[in-house]
């Protein structure tokens, strides 16, 4: 017999203790109900009618999952869109792209469904999206049928639409169109999938001599890392629609939307996943009247604003659209799946806007950073690591970089907490003060690249235990 071989004893290594003990307590997601807003009729844009219903797309009985918005003006609205750059574009994205191209940047309205993305569904999915569009258009009054209805879908990828159920509900939707605040809020509910609250915003502003109104709806909580561009060439999910009664030409509207989206929706991330369906549609129907000296509105039509012909009004509109889109985009982050924190990443003194944006996104998409924020752990090494592997990192000078936590308005001491200065760590970081700052729901991280004058902001949330739970059972 071969000699017996002694079995070595198992050596247990002690894990060195960290500077801060990890919490094992699971935090509950804070209530988001205070983000739900309703509006008086005076704030909602003129010349639009909306409706929504249950079409048995969602499993929950009675859940709103199909909606439409129609411009009731004689002339179709100017229309612009920023759509996903994911190569697996969903059928509704393709249909919307083609409708905008064939319609010369004009549309009558849109139809949206939630619960099924109609993505990666082949020829049948494309046929279904066209049938949705064509059926809405055919049900409108004869004077409103000359141009197409855009299409948006959100939900599970790879499953077919219950198209018969959807088509059967469209006549009912068209008959129930109205412009009431309740109908607008219900329309926002028809966008929802894993969202915990409907996202509707509206406001008014002066544009030259006219009072202009704007309303927006979006949805999203997971699969959020949009990279959207104009539909030429065609490029859980982010969907959004912005409707205004301003009069602006299709090219000017597309230009303004590109600018606004790149500084709002393209600067948010929940989990770093770009959807097949991301779509932001903007409609402008020109229904706003001219203000008289007494402050009343006349029914006089508006001349469409163009970028070159009305440069000052165009800039005002573009900035109003940008700030409005930013508010809508932030709602998506605040409703991030399982999120307990809303985090602003501000990168300043960068050599270019593109560099600042790339650095901020790199931090915001870092799973290690996001879990540290959930654990309220001032682990600034994870921030610096994400800065260092940014695709544009060659433009960064390490010994120029500084990192700080910026306290929220609720913290008594507003002084920034410096963690790193010109590439050197601070010798005595106040961990107790860091804990106070990180305990707040709203957080801000500031990264100073020290090598320019450009700045970008990106908004993200933390990763919690609940995010895994939600996405581990998404289809059930």
UniProtKB/Swiss-Prot annotation:
GO terms for biological process: L-arginine biosynthetic process; ornithine biosynthetic process. The keyword Lyase does not apply. Coiled coil: none annotated. Transmembrane segments: none annotated. Substrate binds at residues 193, 219, 237, 337, 471, 476. It holds the Pfam family ArgJ. It catalyses: N(2)-acetyl-L-ornithine + L-glutamate = N-acetyl-L-glutamate + L-ornithine; L-glutamate + acetyl-CoA = N-acetyl-L-glutamate + CoA + H(+). Its main location: mitochondrion. The active site is at 237 (nucleophile). GO terms for molecular function: glutamate N-acetyltransferase activity; L-glutamate N-acetyltransferase activity. The record marks 154-155 as: Involved in the stabilization of negative charge on the oxyanion by the formation of the oxyanion hole. Catalyzes two activities which are involved in the cyclic version of arginine biosynthesis: the synthesis of acetylglutamate from glutamate and acetyl-CoA, and of ornithine by transacetylation between acetylornithine and glutamate. Heterodimer of an alpha and a beta chain. NCBIfam families: ArgJ, PRK05388.1. Belongs to the ArgJ family. This protein may be expected to contain an N-terminal transit peptide but none has been predicted. This is Arginine biosynthesis bifunctional protein ArgJ, mitochondrial. It comes from Cryptococcus neoformans var. neoformans serotype D (strain B-3501A).
């Amino acid at each position: 017999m071969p000699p017996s071989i002694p079995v070595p004893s198992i050596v247990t290594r002690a894990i060195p203790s960290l500077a801060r003990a990890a919490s094992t307590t699971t935090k509950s997601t804070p209530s988001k109900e205070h983000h739900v807003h309703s509006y008086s009729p005076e704030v909602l844009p003129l010349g639009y009618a909306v409706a929504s219903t249950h079409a048995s797309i969602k499993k929950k009985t009675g859940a709103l999952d199909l909606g439409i918005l129609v411009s009731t003006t004689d002339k179709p609205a100017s229309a612009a869109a920023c759509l996903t750059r994911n190569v697996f574009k969903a059928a509704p994205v393709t249909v919307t792209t083609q409708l905008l191209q064939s319609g010369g940047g004009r549309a009558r309205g849109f139809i949206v469904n939630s619960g099924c993305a109609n993505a990666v569904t082949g020829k049948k999915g494309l046929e279904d999206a066209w049938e949705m569009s064509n059926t809405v258009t055919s049900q409108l009054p004869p004077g409103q049928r000359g141009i197409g209805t855009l299409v948006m879908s959100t939900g599970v990828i790879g499953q077919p639409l219950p198209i018969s159920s959807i088509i059967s509900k469209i006549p009912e939707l068209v008959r129930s169109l109205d412009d009431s605040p309740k109908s607008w809020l219900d329309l926002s509910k028809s966008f929802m999938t894993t969202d915990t609250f409907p996202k509707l915003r509206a406001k008014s502003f002066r544009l030259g001599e006219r009072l202009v109104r704007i309303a927006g709806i979006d949805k999203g909580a997971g699969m959020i890392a949009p990279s959207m561009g104009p539909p030429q060439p065609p490029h859980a999910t982010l969907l959004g629609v912005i409707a205004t009664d301003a009069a602006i030409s299709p090219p000017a509207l597309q230009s303004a939307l590109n600018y606004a989206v790149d500084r709002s929706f393209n600067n948010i991330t929940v989990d770093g996943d770009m959807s097949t369906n991301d779509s932001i549609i903007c409609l402008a129907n020109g229904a706003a009247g001219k203000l008289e000296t007494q402050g009343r509105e006349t029914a006089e039509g508006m001349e469409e604003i163009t970028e070159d012909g009305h440069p000052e009004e165009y800039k005002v509109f573009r900035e109003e659209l940008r700030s409005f889109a930013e508010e809508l985009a932030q709602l998506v982050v605040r409703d991030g799946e399982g999120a307990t924190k809303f985090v602003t990443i501000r990168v300043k003194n960068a050599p270019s806007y593109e560099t600042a944006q790339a650095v901020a996104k790199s931090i915001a998409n870092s799973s290690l950073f996001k879990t540290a924020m959930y654990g309220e752990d001032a682990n600034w090494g994870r921030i610096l690591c994400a800065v260092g592997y940014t695709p544009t990192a060659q433009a960064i000078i390490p010994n120029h970089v500084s990192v700080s936590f910026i306290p929220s308005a609720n913290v008594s001491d507003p002084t920034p907490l410096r963690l790193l200065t010109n590439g050197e760590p601070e010798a005595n970081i106040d961990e107790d003060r860091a804990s106070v700052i990180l305990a707040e729901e709203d957080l801000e991280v500031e990264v100073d690249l020290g090598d320019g004058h450009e700045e970008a902001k990106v908004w993200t949330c933390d990763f919690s235990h609940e995010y895994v739970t939600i996405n581990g059972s998404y289809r059930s």
